[in-house]
Amino acid sequence: MPLRILHVLDHSWPVLDGYAQRSLGIAAAQLQLGMQPSVLTSPLHQQDDPSASETFFGGVRYFRTTDGVGLAGRAVQGRWPFLRELAVMQLLRRRIVSLIKSGSYDIVHAHSPALCGQAASQAAYFCHLPFVYEIRAFWEDGVVRQKTIGTRSMRYWLGKNLETRVARRADAVVAIARPMVDDLESRGIPRAKLFHVPNGVDAARFVPQQRDAALAAQLGVGQTPTLGYLGTLFPWEGVSWLVRAAAELRKRGLVFKLLIVGDGADSAEVKKEIEETGSSSYSLFLGRVPHDQVERYYSLMDVMVYPRSSVRLTEMVTPLKPLEAMALGKAVLGSSVGGIRELIEPEVTGMLFKPGNIEDFCRQAARLLLHEDVRIALGNEARRRVLEERDWKVVVQGYEDVYEAARRNAGARS
């Protein structure tokens, strides 16, 4: 009988951010491996997808948690501080227990944030099922970088401590990056129940392709070598810095286009930087594009740049987008923060530069723009490495050990 897994998520498809993309990849690959995954989303999913309903997608069943009625519903919908979080956990816990009682599951696998983890932990213990907690990023790091809270605030302390508590109660803990595993061990989580299951990519979807001549003509790119960024524009992604660095590179006589695709909290800053550096003649900021058109825009980008700044979040967490670029056989140039160093072997599968160092960036970018043979060699090896190590079909095999440990540890506590 296939292993039946209930994935508990903050949000999921049809929302298509990095969090949802990883979840899609995991569920699809587990299904291919003969497992039976189902997905349940929290009440917060409806804030991004108000018409959410239970559905099948890609052979996987998606359940939803409504945001409720009465005080709990008002707390969620009104985003009342603290009460909203309590309501989310209460509503989600009840929904998980209801699903477990009405169906048959072998594992409850919750994914951060800790609100999902706490609700799933309580439900799994109540129903005597093994509980796995997967941490995609430390919530408190993200909100600090967005300047929502400070490191000395009560919310920061509560968030970090709840995360640690959920991890301690879990029968197995998954982290997507090695620095996160080390951090969790430093919090007292036993190394024996910590597992590293990294980010992956659907290598069957992201395949090398010819330059889209029609789109190149439409955008006025032509055959000009192009630096590209495709992803969400958070401040720590460093895209506004990239505009400044590219302006310096142009001053040195290199001819290229800078193509930026995506949106986010830093969009206004990126636009401002393009204006202040006088970069509009060669910089194209296109905003968000339809998901099914992403590969067309990738095809115009000769060098994919990931200029993350060095902060705790970027040192800890590996991004998804460089893996898409590597699967496409692109030359990748990234800042040498921990999350990117975990993906790129310098001079073999990509190039690295010192975070925030314009001189180092210009040196590496010039080399890639001027030498097509170097770009091709790096891209070919990157694609080969992704197929070997980072295709979702390969990555999800790591969950077999995770689930075995969780079932063993759950048996010991029952």
Can you describe what each PLM-predicted range is?
Residues 268-295:
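Nucleotide-activated donor-binding/catalytic signature segment of Leloir-type glycosyltransferases, i.e.
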Residues 304-306, 324-327, 331-334, 344:
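Short hydrophobic beta-strand element within catalytic cores of glycosyltransferases
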Residues 346-347, 351-358, 367-373:
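Conserved acidic donor-binding segment of nucleotide-sugar-dependent glycosyltransferases
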